[in-house]
A protein has these predicted regions:
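C-terminal subregions of glycosyltransferases and related glycan-biosynthesis enzymes
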Residues: 4-15, 209, 221-353
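Nucleotide-sugar donor-binding/catalytic module of glycosyltransferases
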Residues: 2-235
């Protein structure tokens, strides 16, 4: 395998030996029978085979067992009552036996050398508790961009502070199972951004995160996926940060960073809610638009858009409908044309700054 660059903070003494790790690939499954085949197949076709592949059925009504029939004895199928994605991942991690739990979403795929590359990184840097990789983002069957392409970068120098601003960790991670379980796994009370909250908790506890600077997975942007629900995701970010703010391990300076982040995501949410109100003809549409247009710290793009919504709501609604007809928004605020790739929605990013 070709040498790949590992992005990570400076090494520290961990007391661990750099021995080859074992991996348990876990997949949370809820109503994914038609699409889960490719994900499972990609986990089983790794050049470094995982110790096990665990699929946790989170109370699906579809025939997941039939979808997994081609894999039979090569996959462990867990069943539980519906409790959400975080609950399913926690159950799978608790049942796993590998040194690392490797998260794979049901609609994504690993490239064949991904686990091998992660294993090499673990041997080279036994102090790392979480390792991710770059990935290709796909929409409408075409590659949109790399995950880490300059617009979104992996933080090396000050992971603790930067995680309080944004989640820079691509979510298909390998995380030490013992560390993950010791710190409580994913918080099942948080929706949409539970992975970010978990990485914050681990880093505040001293964990370090590494990233292999090569696209070793395919992350599919889907209009109907959980990642497309922007208002709920933004609320989840605020909930994550509000929980983090109460953490006694934060310094006063770090708590100020959290406060600034909460304010930024609140501005982002305000713009999203103003848009929805304009689109639905809500009675509070003009008030919401004026609040964005005149509010402190909003960027100029958000102000201009909100001013148009306040002064010409019908025109603004027509423009928003046309944009929704032409494109949709996936993970990371990436706006994708319905038949081709597109650029991120800059006004949302502008609202947050």
């Amino acid at each position: 395998m070709a040498t790949r660059s590992l992005l990570a903070p400076p090494a520290v003494t961990s007391g661990r030996t750099g021995s080859p790790p074992t991996f348990s690939v876990i997949i949370a499954a809820y109503e994914v029978a038609p699409i889960v085949h490719a994900a499972v197949e990609s986990a089983l076709q790794q050049t470094l085979r995982p110790k096990e592949v665990i699929v946790c059925d989170d109370g699906s009504s579809d025939d997941l067992q039939a979808a997994l029939e081609p894999f039979r004895d090569r996959v462990v199928l867990l069943r539980k009552e519906h409790g959400g994605e975080a609950s399913a991942k926690n159950a799978a991690a608790a049942a796993a036996s590998g040194d690392f739990v490797v998260i794979l979403d049901a609609d994504d795929v690993f490239f064949p050398e991904r686990l091998e590359a992660i294993a090499e990184a673990v041997v080279a840097r036994p102090d790392l508790d979480v390792i991710t990789t770059d990935a290709y983002l796909e929409a409408n069957g075409a590659i949109v961009r790399h995950c880490y392409d300059g617009r979104w970068r992996f933080e090396v120098d000050d992971q603790r502070t930067e995680l309080l601003r944004r989640n820079f960790v691509f979510g298909l991670v390998a995380v030490r199972r013992e560390v993950f379980l010791r710190h409580g796994g994913f918080d099942e009370s948080i929706l949409w951004t539970t992975d970010w909250e978990c990485w914050i908790r681990l880093v505040l506890s001293g964990s370090k995160i590494g990233c292999i600077d090569a696209p070793l997975a395919l992350y599919r942007l889907r209009e109907d996926s959980l990642s497309a629900r922007r208002e709920e995701i933004t609320r989840g970010k605020i909930m994550t940060l509000e929980k983090t703010r109460r953490d006694s391990r934060l310094s006063d300076e770090e708590r100020a960073v959290v406060d600034a982040s909460i304010a930024g995501y609140a501005r982002e949410l305000a713009l999203l809610l103003a848009r929805r109100s304009i689109l639905t003809g809500g009675g509070d549409a003009r008030r919401r638009a004026i609040a964005v247009a005149t509010g402190p710290r909003f960027g100029w793009r958000a102000r201009v858009e909100a001013a148009l919504m306040a002064l010409a709501p019908r025109r603004a609604a027509k423009r928003l409908r046309r944009r929704e007809e032409d494109s949709w928004v996936g993970a990371g605020g990436i706006r994708v044309r319905r038949e081709s790739s597109g650029d991120p929605d800059s006004s949302i990013a502008d609202a947050h700054t």
